[in-house]
């Protein structure tokens, strides 16, 4: 996320920056305090159902949320419908957010629950049991403000092709990779979103990376002028 943009929307108290300048607390502690203040401001605004705040949150998180839903569903039309429904839930149930956790963790949890609900309504397998993507699942393109660690690692690959490769992974592996490398959540935060034990999250991340490597190698080998690995 663009931290400069966030600072324009949610300003931390002056006392935090003053304390940093005097050196009484570390920069990391100051950043933590700023995030906590931002979360508290969001929680306060959501309890009041502030429409201006919702517009600001959509502007800040729209690309990340839609990308996450695209990876979970593999279908743009479905992802866009769930995108709208997620923000409706945020507005209607905003009082449930207490500001103790990062807002994006709470946001992705809502989105994931909607995907699971839709799967059940359509008599599909649950998210934890879905098989690999079918033939109707297509690669996608979505604008992002800055490259993630995974995108930087794969900077020489076509975005649509990378999306296609990720859609070939088992959904539970794909989800953890997206949350870790695209959304940059910590392993503990991923455990919160997926409601899985931390040990399970670590295992899925390891297995997902192991499964991704040969697929990426096949993608590079299929190119007539494949570049050397980074």
Q: What does each model-found stretch correspond to?
A:
Residues 33, 43-67:
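A short, charge-rich alpha-helical start-of-domain segment used by transcription regulators
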Residues 47-48, 74, 85-102, 121:
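Sigma70-family region 2
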Residues 58-76, 93, 166, 215-219:
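Amphipathic, Lys/Arg- and hydrophobic-enriched alpha-helical face
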Residues 81-88, 101-113, 203:
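Structural recognition of an alpha-helix C-terminal capping motif at a helix-to-coil junction
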Residues 92-99, 109-130, 155, 207, ...:
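Arg/Lys-rich amphipathic alpha helix in sigma70-family domain 2
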């Amino acid at each position: 996320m663009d931290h400069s943009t966030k600072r324009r929307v949610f300003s931390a108290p002056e006392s935090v920056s003053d304390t940093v300048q005097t050196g009484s607390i570390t920069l990391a502690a100051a950043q933590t305090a700023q995030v906590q203040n931002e979360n508290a401001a969001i929680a306060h605004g959501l309890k009041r159902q502030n429409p201006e705040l919702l517009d600001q949150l959509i502007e800040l998180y729209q690309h990340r949320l839609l990308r996450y839903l695209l990876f979970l569903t593999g279908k743009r039309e479905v992802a866009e419908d769930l995108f709208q429904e997620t923000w409706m839930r945020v507005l209607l149930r905003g009082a449930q957010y207490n500001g103790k956790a990062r807002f994006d963790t709470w946001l992705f949890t809502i989105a994931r629950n909607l995907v699971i609900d839709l799967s059940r309504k359509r008599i599909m397998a649950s998210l934890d049991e879905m098989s690999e993507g079918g033939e109707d699942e297509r690669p996608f393109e979505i604008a992002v403000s800055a490259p993630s660690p995974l995108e930087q690692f794969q900077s020489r690959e076509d975005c649509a092709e990378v999306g296609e490769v990720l859609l070939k992974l088992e959904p539970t592996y794909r989800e953890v990779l997206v949350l870790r490398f695209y959304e940059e959540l910590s392993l503990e935060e991923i455990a919160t979103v997926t409601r899985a034990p931390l040990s399970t999250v670590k295992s899925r991340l390891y297995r997902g990376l192991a499964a991704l490597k040969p697929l990426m190698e096949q993608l590079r080998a299929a190119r007539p002028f494949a570049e050397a690995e980074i």
